[in-house]
Amino acid sequence: DRYAIEASFLKNSKKRTLKGIANFGIRPTFHKNSEILEVHLFRFKLNIYNSLLKVDFVEFIRHEKKFSGVEALKKQLKSDIAKAQKILN
């Protein structure tokens, strides 16, 4: 399965490196089917939309899966984020 959650570094055009967790997949919990790359950055509040960015996948965390609902997904994301933070620190 190529859809996965990965610990990742994101670099912007100013070469600033940010830590996060990336999901490449189709968001099955939300009944979507088009591929998308989403990156959740840790402790980051600035607007970087329409910026040139590079995502470096560091380590596989788990395959993407469908959850019973948003609350189950949020619970799993907390665990995923904790794993990614350990990997990236």
Model-found features: residue ranges?
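Phosphate/ribose-recognition catalytic cores of enzymes acting on nucleotide-derived substrates
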Residues: 1-89
